[in-house]
Regions:
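Catalytic beta/alpha-barrel core
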Residues: 6, 142, 158-167, 171, ...
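N-terminal amphipathic alpha-helix/helix-capping segment at the start of soluble metabolic enzymes
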Residues: 67-100, 325, 332-340
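N-terminal small/glycine-rich loop or linker at the start of catalytic domains
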Residues: 83-105, 133-136, 260-269
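Catalytic alpha/beta core domains of metabolic enzymes, predominantly
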Residues: 91, 201-300
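Hydrophobic faces of well-ordered beta-strands that scaffold small-molecule active sites
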Residues: 96-102, 123-127, 161-163, 180-184, ...
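Active-site mouth loops of central-metabolism enzymes
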Residues: 96-112, 136-140, 160-164, 185-186, ...
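Glycine-rich, proline-tolerant flexible connector loops at the mouths of alpha/beta enzymes
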Residues: 126-144, 302-312
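Alpha-helix-loop-beta-strand connector modules within alpha/beta enzyme cores
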Residues: 139-163, 197-204, 253-268, 313-336
Length: 340
């Protein structure tokens, strides 16, 4: 349920209504726009008489929200959310960003790759220090040492870092190392203890869609994080598992405009994991930009044939240079704000 207040509603009136609702045992989510203020009611709304709420002087109207996701719902928050990722980088609304770097942090080559992707125009650095792998015998990541290398690259280049967290017990480690953006990978999209734990922080969370997850399940995963108090969620479409075997996954670009319609949260697209092959990354990156994504996450490695993981889908730095030039050209046409 949402209460849409009149434009004349004062701060005191808003506080009074919020207090009245919370005394009924519900939580509230207040969204202030240019022309209206919306109070979202979260919890058992059967405790609230909508006609009584609507009779209050400053309430314009009351509307029920049928979707199970509330805080992530655009009806609760009509204006696009803009997430501050640190180092002066924001994503959402008219802010378009490119996240780039290797699949795995491998060692000193990280800084070489980071310098190249920044020079090409990437604004955020990705790299996995902890790797969820299908096989227990595959490379699992460098762990804390990998986080240290990411932090060193971030400090040198003044770039926010995006790296995956897999275990609720590691949240404090990520906080201590001041990781800018914690990524929840596809395999952990319904790891509810992890979602709740990162929700207790204020660190931005890049939440990937599960391999077989529906759009509603992605939004409900975001709801888990936001229900704990962390509204800094970035959604990521990274491809879903279908009957098609010619690509690693099927890139569901329908999800980008659908998510924008349903939610105020920023939407990033990952053409690397979606396709699984270098040759398809650029065309799908351009398509994702054209259909309204707020950003891209692209894997780049200076020697893909020697990469410790996912080399088949990594662009070389030279390929990334070319791709960024084309992304810029698309962005000049469709993005509200031109890339730097």
């Amino acid at each position: 349920m949402i209460a849409i207040l009149k434009e004349s509603a004062s701060d005191e009136a808003v506080s009074h209504i919020v207090s009245w609702i919370e005394k009924k045992g519900l939580k509230t989510d207040v969204s202030r726009g240019e022309n209206e203020t919306i109070i979202g009611l979260v919890g058992d709304t059967t405790k609230i008489d909508p006609f009584l709420l609507e009779s209050m002087d400053v309430v314009e109207r009351v509307q029920r929200v049928s979707e199970p996701f509330k805080r992530a719902n655009r009806k609760f928050h009509p204006e696009d959310s803009v997430i501050d990722c640190g180092h002066g980088v924001k994503i959402g609304g008219d802010q378009f960003q490119v996240i780039a770097g290797p699949c795995s942090v491998e060692g000193e080559n990280l800084i070489r790759i980071a310098r190249r992707v920044k020079a090409a125009g990437a604004t955020m650095l990705r790299g996995g220090a902890y790797k969820p792998r299908t096989s227990p015998y595959a490379y699992q990541g460098m762990g804390p040492a990998g986080l240290d290398l990411l932090c060193e690259a971030s400090a040198e280049l003044d770039m926010p870092i995006v790296t995956e967290i897999m275990d609720p017990r590691d949240v404090q480690v990520f906080l201590d190392k001041k990781i800018d953006v914690m990524q929840i990978g596809a395999r952990n999209a319904q790891n509810f203890p992890l979602l709740k734990e990162v929700g207790k922080t204020k660190t931005p969370i890049l939440l990937k869609r599960g391999m077989s997850g529906t759009i509603d399940e992605l939004l409900m995963a975001a709801e888990y994080i936001m229900s704990e108090g962390n509204d800094n969620v970035i959604l990521c479409e990274r491809g879903i598992r279908t009957f098609e075997t010619r690509t690693r996954n099927t890139f569901d670009l329908n999800a980008v405009p659908v998510l924008h319609h349903l939610s105020h949260l920023p939407v990033v697209a990952d053409p690397s994991h979606a396709t699984g092959y270098t040759r398809y990354v650029e065309p799908m990156a351009l398509a994702a930009t054209a259909c309204g994504a707020n950003g891209l996450e692209i894997e780049v490695h200076d020697e893909p044939s020697r990469a410790w993981s996912d080399g088949a889908q990594a662009l070389t730095p030279d390929q990334f240079d070319d791709t960024m030039r084309r992304i810029r050209a698309i962005c000049e046409v469709v993005c509200q704000e031109t890339m730097e």
